[in-house]
Amino acid sequence: MARIAGVDIPREKRIVISLTYIYGIGKTKAQEILKAANVSEETRTRDLTEDELNRIREAIDGIKVEGDLRREVSLNIKRLIEIGAYRGIRHRRSLPVRGQNTKNNSRTRKGPRRTVANKKK
């Protein structure tokens, strides 16, 4: 397995797909990286030369990926919570942040249902 940005990428897949195993790189970003590194998208990871791998690594060095990106996202969320922004409050309460309805749906964000007991009459 080739190791790029601290991640072992699969050998048998096309390089454009293999790069998406790195957090922060999707298919479009992978295509841009390969274009900048002058490497064909159809090449399998196992067929890459050391020179091509180094060019890909150099192209990725300019992009925030993996740990740096995860840290930035978590710091952004922490900042929203600290300043008391509406989005920060939604994060703190584990509710949807982007304005979705919560009466019936949003189970992914809220977690399993917690049944509320009825008052005795």
From Swiss-Prot:
<dbReference type="GO" id="GO:0000049">
    <property type="term" value="F:tRNA binding"/>
</dbReference>
<dbReference type="InterPro" id="IPR019980">
    <property type="entry name" value="Ribosomal_uS13_bac-type"/>
</dbReference>
<keyword id="KW-0820">tRNA-binding</keyword>
<dbReference type="GO" id="GO:0019843">
    <property type="term" value="F:rRNA binding"/>
</dbReference>
<dbReference type="InterPro" id="IPR010979">
    <property type="entry name" value="Ribosomal_uS13-like_H2TH"/>
</dbReference>
<comment type="subunit">
    <text>Part of the 30S ribosomal subunit. Forms a loose heterodimer with protein S19. Forms two bridges to the 50S subunit in the 70S ribosome.</text>
</comment>
<dbReference type="Pfam" id="PF00416">
    <property type="entry name" value="Ribosomal_S13"/>
</dbReference>
<dbReference type="InterPro" id="IPR027437">
    <property type="entry name" value="Rbsml_uS13_C"/>
</dbReference>
<protein>
    <recommendedName>
        <fullName>Small ribosomal subunit protein uS13</fullName>
    </recommendedName>
</protein>
<dbReference type="GO" id="GO:0003735">
    <property type="term" value="F:structural constituent of ribosome"/>
</dbReference>
<feature type="compositionally biased region" description="Basic residues">
    <location>
        <begin position="106"/>
        <end position="121"/>
    </location>
</feature>
<comment type="function">
    <text>Located at the top of the head of the 30S subunit, it contacts several helices of the 16S rRNA. In the 70S ribosome it contacts the 23S rRNA (bridge B1a) and protein L5 of the 50S subunit (bridge B1b), connecting the 2 subunits; these bridges are implicated in subunit movement. Contacts the tRNAs in the A and P-sites.</text>
</comment>
<feature type="region of interest" description="Disordered">
    <location>
        <begin position="94"/>
        <end position="121"/>
    </location>
</feature>
<keyword id="KW-0699">rRNA-binding</keyword>
<dbReference type="GO" id="GO:0015935">
    <property type="term" value="C:small ribosomal subunit"/>
</dbReference>
<comment type="similarity">
    <text>Belongs to the universal ribosomal protein uS13 family.</text>
</comment>
<dbReference type="GO" id="GO:0005829">
    <property type="term" value="C:cytosol"/>
</dbReference>
<dbReference type="InterPro" id="IPR001892">
    <property type="entry name" value="Ribosomal_uS13"/>
</dbReference>
<dbReference type="InterPro" id="IPR018269">
    <property type="entry name" value="Ribosomal_uS13_CS"/>
</dbReference>
<dbReference type="GO" id="GO:0006412">
    <property type="term" value="P:translation"/>
</dbReference>
<keyword id="KW-0689">Ribosomal protein</keyword>
<keyword id="KW-0687">Ribonucleoprotein</keyword>
<keyword id="KW-0694">RNA-binding</keyword>
